[in-house]
Amino acid sequence: MAAAAVSESWPELELAERERRRELLLTGPGLEERVRAAGGQLPPRLFTLPLLHYLEVSGCGSLRAPGPGLAQGLPQLHSLVLRRNALGPGLSPELGPLPALRVLDLSGNALEALPPGQGLGPAEPPGLPQLQSLNLSGNRLRELPADLARCAPRLQSLNLTGNCLDSFPAELFRPGALPLLSELAAADNCLRELSPDIAHLASLKTLDLSNNQLSEIPAELADCPKLKEINFRGNKLRDKRLEKMVSGCQTRSILEYLRVGGRGGGKGKGRAEGSEKEESRRKRRERKQRREGGDGEEQDVGDAGRLLLRVLHVSENPVPLTVRVSPEVRDVRPYIVGAVVRGMDLQPGNALKRFLTSQTKLHEDLCEKRTAATLATHELRAVKGPLLYCARPPQDLKIVPLGRKEAKAKELVRQLQLEAEEQRKQKKRQSVSGLHRYLHLLDGNENYPCLVDADGDVISFPPITNSEKTKVKKTTSDLFLEVTSATSLQICKDVMDALILKMAEMKKYTLENKEEGSLSDTEADAVSGQLPDPTTNPSAGKDGPSLLVVEQVRVVDLEGSLKVVYPSKADLATAPPHVTVVR
């Protein structure tokens, strides 16, 4: 009787166990009552699914603790998302150790303190050795564990926005403590001081400390070698000129001001040291320019094997593409970034096939089988902006899926479920292929996310499919790219970086191998039987560098307030040697 009751109360667990699923999403109506009946914790049976890689429990006001057994029962967990619940005021140590965990999202809870992690002593292994993204935003944290850096030494993104922190632990900025940390967000806290040791964060690209209680910004911040974006708005700084600069100037200007010692360049020894540092940087820049901008035959040889990524700023673009985000998508799949890429050549040989294969590989690896993020590519000529990213009930969402007829999302999902069952019967195994593998990511959602163009047509239904309307073909040279995620904005940017750099590699490969172009009849009709004029193609020259143009796309709310722009100065920062990013 007891087992029957559990199966009836938690059918998702029975299904996940039967189908040997790697991902599980618990949300939607009825979840709160079941968790309350389980004592405010997750059911113990959940921790008997050792194959789980992704677990999300969100929007449950009765969930106060994960429950004992999580670490022991889910050793292969890669992503743990427990956002918008009622976790707190403390968090029991049973959350770790989790040796494979890469993403931990505890945002929107009621946490006031975190348990100390493992790794205090040199002989103790870190509790979260593979963790890359930690989201603690929207809690009530007053302090961070002193050993956070030792617990998660591979951390790349740390979001502490909207807490009650008045300081960072000194260990966080210890030399070599977090060598990979590229994003630190701690806006809307009570921070009073920023340690000069922040300069030890060698990989830091973006820093958001807006709306705190800082009175000074350490000059050492300018020594962060990769820092591209900073936000100190809403702090009452003693240096009023600097306070005015952080409200309106670009990051480069602010760092330059800090680098020379503030107003007047400082005095005495400080000024001399600042001048020496600046002179050293100037010489390095000149050496780099000489290497990159040589003349004569040496430059010609270098150009032939180089590919330029030209970033077109929104202000330079007469018709920039914009994505508006409606509020209801926040509870479904809140994060999206977009970009426009011009200058691809998919006509030669297997170029299109390689392009589509690269997307599949990204979905499998970096996107963690679409659980962390989902990317979509569109024929730009068929995209009519501005675009709207929203969420709709399944019965109201209509799309023409790739290779299928128009259908409502509810009907499409049902059809895919039937096809999945048929696959299992034919192959006599539980695993399925294609789009059928991602259906469980919609479990429990009352609304489905979608991207809608200016004509009102749905061109994307993440994480399931794109629309036939914007299908990429061999004739496609200009593309609109989108990446969405239910996990974090940073993973969207990471996937977009990887996709664009992969496109650059493919462009270089196509040019070097000089494959012959080919068009199918259908594709030839699409361009009226005419191939593009090589003289108008910026990459057609044999002697100069090939060019891809990446246009910035702004994501705004319905009032027009900016949410994110891609690519920003901090994006595309890890380009390979043969790719030069021109901003």
Swiss-Prot record:
Alphabetized, the UniProt keywords read:
Acetylation, Coiled coil, Leucine-rich repeat, Phosphoprotein, Repeat
Q: Which residue stretches does the UniProt record annotate as biased composition, category Basic and acidic residues?
A: 270-281
Q: Is rRNA processing there in the keyword field?
A: no
Question: Which cysteines in this chain are paired by disulphide bridges?
Answer: none
Effect annotated for changing E193D: In a colorectal cancer sample; somatic mutation
Spell out which residues are annotated as carrying Phosphoserine.
Answer: S315, S431, S518, S520
One GO MF term attached to the UniProt entry: phenylalanine-tRNA ligase activity
Fetch the InterPro entries from UniProt.
B3/B4_tRNA-bd, Leu-rich_rpt, Leu-rich_rpt_4, Leu-rich_rpt_typical-subtyp, LRR_dom_sf, Phe-tRNA-ligase_IIc_bsu, Phe-tRNA_synthase-like_B3/B4
What residue spans carry the region label Disordered? 260-300, 513-544
Name any Gene Ontology BP term: phenylalanyl-tRNA aminoacylation
LRR repeat residue intervals: 76-95, 100-121, 130-152, 154-175, 180-202, 203-225, 226-246
- Indicate where the modification Phosphotyrosine is found in the sequence: Y509
Give a yes or no for keyword Cell membrane in this entry.
no
Which ranges form a coiled coil?
402-437
Q: Which residues carry this modification: N-acetylalanine?
A: A2
Record PANTHER family? LEUCINE-RICH REPEAT-CONTAINING PROTEIN 47 (PTHR10947:SF3), PHENYLALANYL-TRNA SYNTHETASE BETA CHAIN AND LEUCINE-RICH REPEAT-CONTAINING PROTEIN 47 (PTHR10947)
User: What is the designated name of this protein?
Assistant: Leucine-rich repeat-containing protein 47
Q: Organism source for this protein?
A: Homo sapiens
The gene designation is LRRC47
